[in-house]
């Protein structure tokens, strides 16, 4: 479910979310990929190599659809669309946002007083708040009995909007 909603995770992010060691995560991810639950790709880099990036595979989509009592078509899953994120110009932005939240979730997994109680991607935020605000993510963090709701604005100078213009909608 998490992968379907957030579109793509690196092997390192998945390890942070659910495993104690990267090697264990990579073994499990290889198995899930071989079974068709996940698909993976490795973006091209000019130097070095990128970690594998994982998206929902056809078997994973069928499992998710069955869990929700709908068809794969109703779910809106298409393998080509899932894999197209590999060439999406905003892939680095999605990975930064997912990396931030994966780090919080990983911290919470290792610290019993902490919890990432909510984690919404940009698409879900847009569906909820429309054009009023357009955060890259929303979260609810709990730690030691205190809860904080927050919006993530991930600006790396790639969008033609000033930070003050982006924050204006939050006043409402």
PLM features: residue spans?
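A generic fold-level signal
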Residues: 48-49, 95, 132
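Long, contiguous hydrophobic alpha-helical segments, chiefly transmembrane helices and signal peptides
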Residues: 3, 8-9, 28, 54-56, ...
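Active-site metal-binding core of divalent-cation-utilizing nuclease and nuclease-like domains
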Residues: 41, 86-92, 109-150, 155-169
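Short, low-complexity, polar/charged sequence segments that are solvent-exposed and flexible
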Residues: 72-76, 138, 169-172
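Nuclease-adjacent, charged terminal/linker segments that flank catalytic cores
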Residues: 1-84
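Amphipathic alpha-helical dimerization/coiled-coil segments
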Residues: 66-118
């Amino acid at each position: 479910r998490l992968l379907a909603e957030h579109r793509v995770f690196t092997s390192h992010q998945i390890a942070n979310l659910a495993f104690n060691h990267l090697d264990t995560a990579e073994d499990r991810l290889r198995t899930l990929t071989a079974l068709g639950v996940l698909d993976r790709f490795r973006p091209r880099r000019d130097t070095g190599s990128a970690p594998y990036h994982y998206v929902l595979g056809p078997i994973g989509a069928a499992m998710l659809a069955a869990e929700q009592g709908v068809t794969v078509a109703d779910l809106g899953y298409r393998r080509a669309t899932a894999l197209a994120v590999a060439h999406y110009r905003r892939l680095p932005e999605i990975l930064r946002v997912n990396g931030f939240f994966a780090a919080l979730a990983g911290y919470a997994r290792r610290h019993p007083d902490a919890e990432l109680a909510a984690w919404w991607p940009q698409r879900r935020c847009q569906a909820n708040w429309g054009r009023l605000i357009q955060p890259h993510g929303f979260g609810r963090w709990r730690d030691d009995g205190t809860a904080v709701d927050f919006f993530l604005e991930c600006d790396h100078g790639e969008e033609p909007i000033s930070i003050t213009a982006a924050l204006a909608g939050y006043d409402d």
